[in-house]
Amino acid sequence: MIIVTGGAGMIGANIVKALNDMGRKDILVVDNLKDGTKFINLVDLDIADYCDKEDFISSVIAGDDLGDIDAVFHEGACSATTEWDGKYLMHNNYEYSKELLHYCLDREIPFFYASSAATYGDKTDFIEEREFEGPLNAYGYSKFLFDQYVRAILPEANSPVCGFKYFNVYGPREQHKGSMASVAFHLNNQILKGENPKLFAGSEHFLRDFVYVGDVAEVNLWAWENGVSGIFNLGTGNAESFKAVAEAVVKFHGKGEIETIPFPDHLKSRYQEYTQANLTKLRAAGCDFKFKNVAEGVAEYMAWLNRK
């Protein structure tokens, strides 16, 4: 059996799809479906069972026998960079992750988890070491602290433990994320409503490493199949502008002119203007995966979003 926490979320559901594509259906999805709309992410996927997050973590803490587990993909977390309830974030993103990590270590179950480029804050080297990290928000700090915890235990681990610092992930199965959904998602909705796509003023200068979620899922499976341990950046290694995303959306629809809107005050000083994954460590680990660029990934995503 394979466990995917956050399996009804964007990245988790895409990992489930990638597992299905390789013939695996013996999958336990763990999630919190208080937001019932997330069920749609699982409708076309094959899983063996579902477990509520709270029930699952209770079983983990109790040390219950969950069966023969081949791997755990831990994608469940609060991913809102605008969330400032630190107690909630630390419980959900840090304490929960530690419990599951130790459950896996004790049983030598390969453990793969979601970290984030938010751990870097406004630092621009994007190298997977503590000296290059400095989160700007509580979400980033919760992910940073778990990375630090993993670094401390890695030398003694007898089974794979692998974290991925996700950069700007976009693609299918993100519709439940609301304001935290990707720019491509929001621009598509604007055009469908007959509006012009809107970007923040200055967006031509904001460069991000936009990585397609299908590629993210494939690299997770590569790490599992190759028994990889460590903490790695997961982006394309190439920063592109928000304008490039908008142009790809406009090209798909064949209509719309890009407009600019004022930059929100509440995001100033907490906004990463530039991200670009340094892939040196990932490539050195043997990953030669070819990532989609914005034009390729957004075109595929638009076709998926607008399918009949």
From Swiss-Prot:
Alphabetical list of Pfam families matching this protein: Epimerase (PF01370)
Annotated substrate binding sites: N168, S179, H186, F200, A201, G202, S203, R208, Y271
Free-text comment on the cofactor: Binds 1 NADP(+) per subunit.
One GO BP annotation of this record: carbohydrate metabolic process
GO MF term set: ADP-glyceromanno-heptose 6-epimerase activity; NADP binding
UniProt entry tagged with the keyword NADP: yes
Binding residue positions for NADP(+): 10-11, 31-32, 38, 53, 75-79, 92, 143, 169, 177
Keywords from the UniProt entry: Carbohydrate metabolism, Isomerase, NADP
Sections of the chain in a coiled coil: none
The protein's annotated pathway: Nucleotide-sugar biosynthesis; ADP-L-glycero-beta-D-manno-heptose biosynthesis; ADP-L-glycero-beta-D-manno-heptose from D-glycero-beta-D-manno-heptose 7-phosphate: step 4/4
Listed CDD domains: ADP_GME_SDR_e
Similarity remark: Belongs to the NAD(P)-dependent epimerase/dehydratase family. HldD subfamily.
Subunit field text: Homopentamer.
This protein's domain notes: Contains a large N-terminal NADP-binding domain, and a smaller C-terminal substrate-binding domain.
Name the record gives this protein: ADP-L-glycero-D-manno-heptose-6-epimerase
Species, as recorded: Mannheimia succiniciproducens (strain KCTC 0769BP / MBEL55E)
Source taxonomy: Bacteria, Pseudomonadati, Pseudomonadota, Gammaproteobacteria, Pasteurellales
